[in-house]
C-alpha cells in the first residue's frame, strides 16, 4: 500500500477524545488530526516524536487530516490506522504473500456470518475446498519486547473468536490473522494481563480448529505492506 499523495510529517502533541490528535508542523502551526484507531493505543503515543498524516480533499470532512504513522523513540514505526489492516491483507492475498491462504478462487469482504450478527473481514471461496473465514486484527502493543493483542478489553474480539469457533465446527476453515503494524514487534501473544477472557477464548479456539497466523508489516513514510510471518505465542 503506497501512500499517495505523500504523507506529511509533524510532531505529536497529544491524543484526546479518542479520535483526535494535535500535532505541530515544521513551521510551528498546530493542526488537529483524525485518529483512526478505536483502541487504547497503549505504548503507541510518544509526544514530541514524529507522526505522518494523510490529507483528504473531501470538503465534507470535519477533519481533513488523518493520522497514519507514529515514530517510536527507538527509531521504529507504528501503523496507527487500524482500518488499513483489512486492505493490507487483501493486497497480500492477491500477491500470494500469505502462503497459508493461497489457492482460492474468490475473495469477498464484510460478509454476514455466524450467530451473533457479525461480518467476516475476508471470505475466501473455492469449488475445490471449504470456505475460509478470516478475521483480521491489527497488533501494535509492545511490552518488554513482546507484541500483544488486544490493548484493551475487547468484547468485540471475544465475539469474533466465538464466531470463528462456530465456523470451524461447521467444517469451514476459520482463521484469525494478526497484522503486526509495529516494526519492533517480532511475535504476538494474547494479552492475558489486559483481557484474560480473550486469552482463554483464544486457547479454546485453537483447540476447536481455528488457525492463528501473524504477519509483520514493513513500514515507511512511503508505503506499508505485509512482509513475513512471525510466531504466535499462546
Curated annotation (Swiss-Prot):
The name this protein goes by in its record: Sugar fermentation stimulation protein homolog
HAMAP family found in the cross-reference section: SfsA
InterPro entries in the record: SfsA, SfsA_C, SfsA_N
Pfam families: SfsA, SfsA_N
Molecular function terms from GO: DNA binding
Family: Belongs to the SfsA family.
Family annotation (PANTHER family): SUGAR FERMENTATION STIMULATION PROTEIN A
Domain of life from the UniProt record: Bacteria
